């Protein structure tokens, strides 16, 4: 594709993983969730991520406890503190594994590239 001709497949796999993680974070944070709906919300996020170019696997966890929802409405929202995501992208012979997880020592929902690997086609 002409828009990516200056990128190697390796660079594009990394780019697509990062774009997908950012889209998940900024699109789904704020979504209402409860312990009874957390798994469904996570599956919805996974299915949406798999629509992104080059994404071949998406694993999402939304960790919501009953303590989080002990309030008037009985729910909380998806946030950087309760969202854990693993994305795998493939472009050509390269795969990238991207992660999103709240890191306590940083007090921050960090996105990073965990692995880049060459695969057989």
UniProtKB/Swiss-Prot annotation:
What EC number(s) does its UniProt record assign? 4.1.2.25
Annotated coiled-coil positions are none
Q: Indicate yes or no for the key word NAD.
A: no
Functional summary from the UniProt entry: Catalyzes the conversion of 7,8-dihydroneopterin (H2Neo) to 6-hydroxymethyl-7,8-dihydropterin (6-HMD).
Gene that encodes the chain: mptD
Pathway of this protein?
Answer: Cofactor biosynthesis; 5,6,7,8-tetrahydromethanopterin biosynthesis
What is the name listed in the Swiss-Prot or TrEMBL entry for this protein? Dihydroneopterin aldolase
The text of the family note is: Belongs to the archaeal dihydroneopterin aldolase family.
Q: Which domain of life is it from?
A: Archaea
């Amino acid at each position: 594709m002409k828009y990516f001709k200056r990128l190697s497949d390796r660079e594009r796999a990394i780019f697509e993983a990062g774009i997908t993680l950012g889209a998940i974070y900024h699109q789904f944070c704020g979504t209402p969730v409860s312990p009874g709906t957390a798994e469904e919300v996570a599956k919805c996020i996974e299915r949406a991520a798999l629509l992104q170019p080059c994404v071949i696997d998406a694993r999402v966890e939304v960790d919501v406890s009953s303590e989080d929802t002990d309030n008037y409405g009985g729910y909380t929202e998806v946030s950087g503190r309760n969202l854990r995501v693993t994305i795998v992208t493939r472009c050509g012979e390269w795969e990238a594994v991207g992660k999103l997880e709240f890191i306590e020592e940083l007090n921050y929902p960090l996105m990073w590239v965990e692995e880049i690997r060459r695969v057989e086609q």
